[in-house]
Amino acid sequence: MIHLNILYWPPAGGFGLNTNILEINIINLAVVLGVLIYLGKGVCAGCILNDLLENRKQTILSTIHDAEERYEEATEKLNQARTRLQQAKVKADEIRVNGLTQMEREKQDLINAADEDSRRLEDSKNSTIRFEEQRAIEQVRQQVSRLALERALESLNTRLNNELHSRMIDYHIGLLRAMESTTDQFL
């Protein structure tokens, strides 16, 4: 018959803990455990424990070694990333400077083109003004000549009578004969 009176049922029907050391056989359990440890120490328990500790040690060392390798790889990748970042910053600065230079050059080209267009427009305007002035002057001359001719004809018509008309014709005929004789001498 096995006596396990570690837990007992009190008469009231509740749950409780037996604190009587003699009734729970704690001394017997301690003696059995002590003998097992003493006998197992030299045989297999020590080997198993040593093997377990050695395996655990190797696992920990392997984990540490793997962690160190990953740390070295991560450090190398970080350094490479920093190098690429620095190169990217340098390239970005070059692009920014080139962009600003290009923008200034294009701005200056636009200013120069606008100045050239302005100069050409000014020249064209001045040329058009001179042309229009010449045309206006020519129109005024033609009008003045026409008016002068009309007045002269009007004056001649009012003053010219038959006798004056005959004298004018004779005078011009004489001029033409004189011119004809002069040209015959040169030939």
Swiss-Prot record:
InterPro entries: ATP_synth_b/b'su_bac/chlpt (IPR002146). It comes from the Eukaryota. Pfam families: ATP-synt_B. Keywords: ATP synthesis, CF(0), Chloroplast, Hydrogen ion transport, Ion transport, Membrane, Plastid, Thylakoid, Transmembrane, Transmembrane helix, Transport. It is a single-pass membrane protein. The keyword Chloroplast applies. GO terms for molecular function: proton-transporting ATP synthase activity, rotational mechanism. Its main location: plastid. It is found in: Plastid, Chloroplast thylakoid membrane. The chain crosses the membrane at residues 29-49. One of its GO terms (cellular component) is chloroplast thylakoid membrane. F(1)F(0) ATP synthase produces ATP from ADP in the presence of a proton or sodium gradient. F-type ATPases consist of two structural domains, F(1) containing the extramembraneous catalytic core and F(0) containing the membrane proton channel, linked together by a central stalk and a peripheral stalk. During catalysis, ATP synthesis in the catalytic domain of F(1) is coupled via a rotary mechanism of the central stalk subunits to proton translocation. In plastids the F-type ATPase is also known as CF(1)CF(0). F-type ATPases have 2 components, F(1) - the catalytic core - and F(0) - the membrane proton channel. F(1) has five subunits: alpha(3), beta(3), gamma(1), delta(1), epsilon(1). F(0) has four main subunits: a(1), b(1), b'(1) and c(10-14). The alpha and beta chains form an alternating ring which encloses part of the gamma chain. F(1) is attached to F(0) by a central stalk formed by the gamma and epsilon chains, while a peripheral stalk is formed by the delta, b and b' chains. Belongs to the ATPase B chain family. This is ATP synthase subunit b, chloroplastic. It comes from Angiopteris evecta. The lineage of its organism: Eukaryota, Viridiplantae, Streptophyta, Embryophyta, Tracheophyta.
